[in-house]
Amino acid sequence: MDIVSRQKVRRFEAGTFQEIESSVATEYPLTIYVNDQELVTIVCTPEHLEDLVVGFLTSEGIVRGPGDIDSVDIIEATGHAKVSANFVNKFNAKYRGKRYITSCCGKSRENFYFQSDASLVNVKQNSNLKLTTDRIFRLMEKFEQNSATFHQTGGVHNAALCSSAEIIYSRMDIGRHNALDKIYGRALKDGTATDDKAIIFSGRISSEILVKTAKLGCGIILSRSAPTELAINMAEELNITTVGFIRGDRLNVYSGFERIT
């Protein structure tokens, strides 16, 4: 399925209108069924969908990890993801229902977001990863080079998992949470250790994005944008280093200063 479509638009430039074709990000509703019970519909970008399903179910505490999942069957034509699981968290099972998560990740997401996050309050990240400012600038440059769909459409979020030397996975989605869930799902499926890795994110570091980073087990998050006050407070509590406004040869470190040299 195409992740970008071409649409006719009227562009106003230099005092006149002209008809052109513009690239637009595809918006795709994916309904997840767990053991034949409808759980949720996520509006997403239609690529790396199995990664999204595994990452979402684990991140939201529906399952404990990929070992609880026997199979994931993605039916693109109908927009269904059918999951067979050998274990489903009983605490979260009561939240099953026809919920709809939009690409803007608004109030509909909160029903899921706060279910399994309370346990994170006292879970501090013990990452030993340290990054130099020069290494951060190089990683961000590579990240930007891997953001072709964003530059083409301006309508997606990008995320990456990286070591101190290289970017390991890059994922993009119209939903900022989805991009991180895709990273999480891929890492879980591959058995990739994350405690010595960092997250690079294209957008604002909100409290939700900070929590996603904590769930991934990463001790550093990097962004071209800024964190919110709540995200900084949570980062200090969870021992996560937040670095924002990475542009050109400057950056701001908001928490976890000892990991950046």
From Swiss-Prot:
HAMAP family, sorted: FdhD
Organism: Listeria innocua serovar 6a (strain ATCC BAA-680 / CLIP 11262)
Xref: InterPro entries: Cytidine_deaminase-like, FdhD
Record gene name: fdhD
GO molecular function: sulfur carrier activity; sulfurtransferase activity
Coiled-coil blocks: none
Gene3D superfamilies cross-referenced by the UniProt entry: 3.10.20.10, Cytidine Deaminase, domain 2
Keywords: Cytoplasm, Molybdenum cofactor biosynthesis
Protein name stated in the entry: Sulfur carrier protein FdhD
Listed GO biological process terms: Mo-molybdopterin cofactor biosynthetic process
Subcellular location: Cytoplasm
The family this protein is said to belong to: Belongs to the FdhD family.
A Pfam family the protein falls into: FdhD-NarQ
